[in-house]
């Protein structure tokens, strides 16, 4: 396990909308380089960079046509190497986005695979053995695409043909389903290793793996896919022990034993995560909602078994959002609401991820036309709001030439305005990041224990502990004040306020009463008894 993950706080950068350095309306790598100072100011120490490879951009770069070259709209391989080098000098590590399971239909490998004549790439993708065979359990196919007599299996959109990592349980009725140890699946695995090695040698610190559980087909329990990643992890541990990999699998109990250092909790596959910030209001409220109708047990009853089963093997990552999650965290929330959400995100175990702009409370824009396969996700991908200059400081291009429009309301949050405000959300998030990194009890692998977490009640109180240091975190997202008795956890001396609400503890008999105003919380160091 790379030691640096213990103190890691990640920041997700969507390159096309972060900062445009050349005025063409699209963000780029030199633009990110110019903004490294901001990341250092914020206090994050790691970056997840969304796909930046050559692509026709039908799915915003998740349709790769060359895994070894940076897309010209973002810059060059030399630009990316410069970014790696300069970031590392500033204490920042960069993880690339690895689309391991499929390519674009524009990839030269796939174009060769489409040919009716047998060649080196014929079996690098999954094809049925007749154009008239278009269905098989567990896969979807695109029919009649090529002169080759067969239909190809796709992972998501029709232009994302699945690479052939084999089938865990090939169906004898479908001889085109190759076992995982067949020559072509083994060749594809070797190519994946080559891609990983290429970018690690250039300076990447690891990878976020897109659709990590999708590689081996007809693998219902994920065992063969897990075996593949375990082999990669063993190789990384030997040759690149400081490299980290995180999976988009949303199944920590599968992904972490499979070799990933981290696995995301995500709305799809994790109702508990959804209950924190984005539970549909027509059924019930999220926990972080001032109405006070949320329930922390909806999260904890799912999270705790996952945490207990994986805590000695890897980390669960709880993100503030990402490019696929709508709406943004800032939608419908005040700065106080958001501060409390970040108090939670930055004091929980595992590795936190901040989606660009969430630290200033950026909002999704409704009603945007889909861009590069974004569809309903497009509004959560708009340009970073740097200042009050045209285009929010994102680009000098004419507004109608921007990759996506910026929010133009007078009250839009910006980095410049919040840097100038000592009590701004941005500076609160900075304080919380610094708090996390200054206290071993708040590191990724330090112990976690709920102290008060009753269904439908407030506050939510938990302990983090490492060695002699114990920190109590209390959260009241409801607009009404709350009070709870805390017995047995404290000494006779009141806890030290590290962050947030002061004067929260009152001595009551042999115990303590914890009182929190509405929409408030704090982190408190406990003294030894």
Briefly describe each language-model feature range.
Residues 481-501:
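Beta-strand-rich binding/interaction modules
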Residues 5-6, 239, 259, 298, ...:
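Loop/helix patches that line or flank the sugar-binding groove of alpha-linked glycan CAZymes
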Residues 2-190, 201, 212-259, 384, ...:
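Acidic/aromatic-lined carbohydrate-recognition and catalytic surfaces
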Residues 496-512:
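Solvent-exposed beta-strand/loop surfaces of large extracellular or lumenal domains
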Residues 508-529:
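C-terminal beta-strand-rich structural cap/linker in extracellular carbohydrate-active enzymes
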Residues 105-139, 229, 233-383, 388:
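Conserved alpha/beta catalytic core and glycan-binding cleft of carbohydrate-active enzymes
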Residues 16-18, 53-55, 100-101, 205, ...:
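Short, solvent-exposed loop/turn segments at secondary-structure junctions
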Residues 196-218, 318-322:
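Active-site groove signature of glycoside hydrolases
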